Amino acid sequence: CALPIFQMALPLLVQPDAVVENEDLPVSTPLLYPSAGLPAVIDTEAAFSDAIANLAQGSGPFALDAERASGYKYSARAYLIQIKREGGGLHLIDPIAFGPGHRLFSELNELLQSEEVILHASTQDLPCLRELGINPSLLFDTELGARIAGLPRVGLGPLLESLMGVSLAKEHSAVDWSQRPLPSDWLNYAALDVELLVELRNKVYQLLEDAGKLQWALEDFAAILAAPPAPPRVDPWRRTSGMHKVKKRNQMAVV
């Protein structure tokens, strides 16, 4: 695995005969590809039905994530859904191919009621998932759980690195997910967001239990699901960065 940047720079900073003790320095393993390979994007009813059937054959909680295009679109709709379950495979679903309220999203939602659903920073993804008809009844939020446990860095990448010794590239986190077709490297990035989410959940669960904060966290997760949805933003374009600089009518039309 790659050495941390500061280790690579050591030869420039010490004398040739100096002895550098680096046995205790943390070394992480890059997570480059899903363990079972990158699945094809699901954009047909037949493929969606097969995915639901495969997930039903699995066991344990569901790792779930959604990709949005917040930096490019005023809406917060989902442009890709990633879901994984032990024994049920990893699946990438194109929600644009089906639309909100499609019967297959209803079938998927019915399946999700049977087990815990794991999300990272759930309040970001739940609105767009609910718009499609996906509304979990039992939630574990790894980001919030880590925050309650007192960890200093609670992003998905830092958590995987600190708790599991795995580094996750995040260079595609702010791309335009509404683009079609989605590039394979973007899809690979998206798949990795759920690749180890179940294992990460177990690590955070243990931290919460050890700290005596598990019940607190579970109550907070339930409160997130019970909270009423936020009202839609009025004129979201008004929140565009740099709007105060727009003076001309033709510039305003672009916004």
Sequence positions of predicted segments:
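Short, small-residue-biased leader/transition segments that mark boundaries at the very start
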Residues: 1-3
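N-terminal accessory regions of nucleic-acid-interacting proteins
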Residues: 6-62, 66
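Short acidic catalytic loops
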Residues: 62-67, 141, 193
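A broadly used, surface-exposed interaction patch
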Residues: 82, 86-107
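Metal-dependent phosphoesterase core characteristic of DEDDh/y 3'-5' exonuclease domains
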Residues: 82-84, 88, 123-179, 187
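Short active-site oxyanion
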Residues: 90, 111-117
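Acidic, Mg2+-coordinating catalytic module of metal-dependent nucleases/exonucleases
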Residues: 168-229
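C-terminal accessory/connector segments of nucleic-acid motor ATPases
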Residues: 211-255
